[in-house]
Design a protein with these regions (language model features):
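N-terminal secretory/membrane targeting signals
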Residues: 2, 6-16, 21-62
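Hydrophobic alpha-helical transmembrane segments of multi-pass integral membrane proteins
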Residues: 46, 50, 92-108, 135-148
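Non-transmembrane, membrane-proximal soluble domains of secreted or membrane proteins
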Residues: 62-90, 111-318
Length: 318
């Protein structure tokens, strides 16, 4: 063999060998990058799981009002709220499991079917078994969600053997409350201005001048409507969020257990209703039956004739 040809052959062989080494190195580097990406992604997944499933942790909001950095819902108080939180936890676990499975499949597909691993991609157009699976499984998941969802919906909608009725009327931008079972007195509830709230140590944008007062251990019917535009009476601790619609009556119910006597629960209007929508807080104070009866006696004197026209002056008969 000519020396020059032999040298060329050796160089070509060396180049091929180097090409194989470079190809293997690139593949290893790609694998390493994927592994590093997964390792970097793993703490994020753990953090997401902690956030999603941490609804029973120590960062839960205090009873009746939101707290800074809270996770999950406020502590449930009413029977509807307890069932609602169970449903919320079920949905959280389902969403977490589905998200993890989809993400794992996505990472697997990115690695297993990359261009380097599959220079000639598959031309498969359909897969009967796979199509049946990804049709049936979502249907089953929806059924798992629908059954407790409808149970909760009808449980919140039923009003049986109500001990007390509270009428709620939304107005721009305050609430009016009526107590038809206790003399039919009426009063308005407006937000305390921010300067006064800060000066007196009250909850800014949450405390009101006349809170709703409700007795504990009583089934309470809530009837809502509006005097102008659509409002929404939302009370997270009681799991109530119901529209107040002009010309229509919406109804729900609640029950506050006895251990919450003395607690004030806060909520807000949750339907955009105009320029001062953010200044329509709701405050509900739970009291014992004895305290409620004493408050009713006082409220009847204070509010019973508040909306009646002034008496007409007449001339003396003498």
């Amino acid at each position: 063999m000519h020396p020059k040809k032999g040298m060329i052959h050796q160089v070509t062989k060396a180049q091929r060998g180097w090409g194989r080494v470079r190809h293997i190195a690139l593949r290893c580097n790609a694998r390493g990058q994927i592994r590093m990406s997964i390792k970097k992604l793993f703490p994020i997944l753990l953090l997401g799981l902690a956030v999603l499933t941490g609804v029973d942790g120590a960062a839960i909001a205090a009873v009746g009002q939101p707290e800074p950095w809270q996770l999950g819902l406020q502590d449930p108080v009413s029977p509807v709220a307890v069932e609602g939180q169970k449903f919320f936890n079920l949905l959280t676990w389902l969403m977490t499991i589905i998200t993890v499975i989809v993400l794992a499949l996505l990472l697997y597909v990115l690695f297993r079917f990359s261009a380097k691993r599959n220079p000639v991609p598959s031309k498969t157009t359909h897969h009967t078994l796979l199509e049946v699976v990804w049709t049936v499984v979502p249907v089953l998941i929806l059924l798992v969600i629908a059954i407790p969802s409808f149970r909760l919906l009808y449980f919140a909608d039923r009003v049986e053997d109500a001990d007390l009725t509270l009428k709620i009327i939304g107005k721009q931008w305050y609430w009016t409350y009526e107590y038809p079972d206790n003399g039919n007195f009426t009063f308005d509830s407006l937000m305390i201005d921010q300067e006064t709230a800060v000066a007196e140590g009250l909850n800014r944008l949450l405390d009101v001048d006349n809170p709703v007062v409700l007795p504990v251990d009583q089934n309470i019917r809530l009837i809502m409507t509006s005097d102008d535009v659509i409002h929404n009476w939302a009370m997270p601790s009681l799991f109530i969020k119901l529209d107040a619609v002009p010309g229509r009556l919406n109804e729900t119910w609640t029950r506050i257990p006895g251990e919450y006597a003395g607690t004030t629960f806060y909520g807000q209007c949750s339907e955009l209703c105009g320029v001062n929508h953010a200044y329509m807080p709701i405050a509900v104070k739970a009291v014992t039956m004895e305290e409620y009866e004493a408050w009713v006696a006082k409220a009847q004197e204070e509010f019973a004739s508040a909306d009646l026209p002034s008496a007409v002056s007449v001339a003396s008969a003498e």
